[in-house]
Amino acid sequence: MVTHAMEEPKTFNIPTFVLDENCNFIPEVLSRANAKYIKDVLIQDSYNTVCLANSFIPMTIQTAEQIMVIITKFKFSRARDLFEKVLRLGVHINRFYAGKKQVKHMITMMKSLFDTEEAMRRLDRALMGLFVDARGSSYMPLIALSLHENGLPDSKFTKAVKLINTTLNSFHNRPDADIEQYAQKLRAYNYLYKIPHYTLKEAVDVYSENLKDLSIGVNKKPTLLFTSSDDGYLSHIFNDMLFLTSTWNMIYNCKVQIRRLTTWIKYEINSIVEDCVLVGFQLPDLKDTILDLAALTSNMNLVDPDKDLFSHYKLILEKLFEISIFATKANICILPTFIKSHLIEFEDVLKRSNDDEDLNYLLLKSNDSDDEYDEDKLPIQVDPGRVDNVLTDSNFFNVTADNAFSSIAIMPISYDKIIDVEENVIQVLEVEMQSLSAVVYGAVANKYGLSLPQVIKRLNQNEGRASSRASSSHSTSTIPYSPPQSGRSTPTSILRQRAPIRSNSRSSSVSFSQDDDNRSHYSDETNISDYSYPMADLDLEDEEPMEDHPHSPQSASSNNSMSRRSRALQNEQRRRTPTMAPPSPARGQNNARLRRRTRRSTETNDERL
């Protein structure tokens, strides 16, 4: 059956794509190691679609996006959200770099058709023969002067084709049978090419080879019918003029797509930087890498848009693949939107809290009862005229060099749990996160104009009252902090400044490691009030001995054996910890009234004296 299908005649040849190990990435854009990483992560059918979208065929950005169907293998699905964005960005950068070289080659080859005086005279004679009934009009100069890379946008191309079609009745030029369907072969190697109404199948065959050579990059002058023979048939001139105008229009649209890619790529890079910052809160070991990424992105944003940005794109893409590979090997679920949801929650709590309230208590408390769900309970009624969506605030989370990784008070804690599936060999690795395991305080503080020391102070001001579940002495650590700067300075100088801030928890270093079974060991089940991930280059003062801490180096060998015991101790500790209720608003009002009365009585006594 396959043999019979192969023997059937075809109206045109479908281009074959060589699926090499580089996924059609140019070596100047992406290294072989990163290309192999893409091939290892994607399933085969998805890999083929990426190769097609990343091929030499000129196409719009929308077409490339629709062609790519990114499906990762199941074992790599945890980092899929980040990997998909990085891969799409890489394809667009590759098309940007290859497209600029492709357009330059097309222009050179098309200009070589009439690079001599004799060739220009032949073009003049052809136009005069075609427009024999309109020699006194401006048709010929308008078309001849438009045959260059900037001369035929879609509007002028449509008018030029209409002018050429007006000459169709001046000579006997009957189209060949099924010419419209046959001409579709011209789109095989170029999705931006607009097919005019050709009349000769012979011309379509010649122009198809021309477009193939132009798209692939063959150093060969295109072939025209009226220049390849001494017979100046009007039908040949008619089809050649349609090819010239449509090809120059295609080149113009290629340049338009490259300009659009520039805007698209810059937007995508700035968007992915935000996701990478959120990923960094799940993987603190990536902090320095993401700081470098933020500096590279800031440099790119400061460059004049008219300058060539490919060198910036290449460095940024290398950093993004470094982060993506690290996140894939970490084997934890990468959820930037989950981290951002806690940003929104913390912002809401920050707006509604008072200065003397414990934010940790407000964030961790639950208003839901422990009873079973009551299906008869009516939902809370909200005014239908009210529109309040924090996600519509574009300035909510704007990652800049000033607030990227300025401080982290609570870091995400993830742990592995192996679930046996019906005593089978198959095991499911489930990664869970604490109910409130990651809050980016720096970004929220930056929005409200607060300093990081003020936010940390509010988080730690009640630690003396809550010290029953922690040790009486606390360590002081120096955490990197980048205060807002005025004036213009380099991103590196902004990102590398330091200022001391008091931490609310003990710190210990955690390094990335991976066992043979590819499991993550960032932490076991740990209470977030007793442990937080540190920043790099911490200076610890009077730190308590941590031999009893489940993550200390002394107890590294006994982590697995003590996981159940630590879980039981933590549950017992939570039950014993008293609930820290926020102060009553009425009590605060009474205190305020008492202070006002005292102040008035003091002022009265002063006046009497």
Curated annotation (Swiss-Prot):
Basic and acidic residues: bias regions: 600-609
Alphabetical list of InterPro entries matching this protein: Herpes_pp85 (IPR006731)
Alphabetical UniProt keywords: Host cytoplasm, Phosphoprotein, Virion, Virion tegument
GO cellular component terms given for this protein: host cell cytoplasm; viral tegument
Region of interest called Disordered, as start-end residue ranges on this chain: 461-609
Keyword check for Phosphoprotein: yes
Low complexity biased stretches: 465-478, 503-513, 552-563
PTM comment, free text: Phosphorylated.
Compartments where located: Virion tegument; Host cytoplasm
Highest taxon, organism lineage: Viruses
Comp. bias intervals (Polar residues): 484-495
Family: Belongs to the herpesviridae pp85 family.
Name of this protein: Phosphoprotein 85
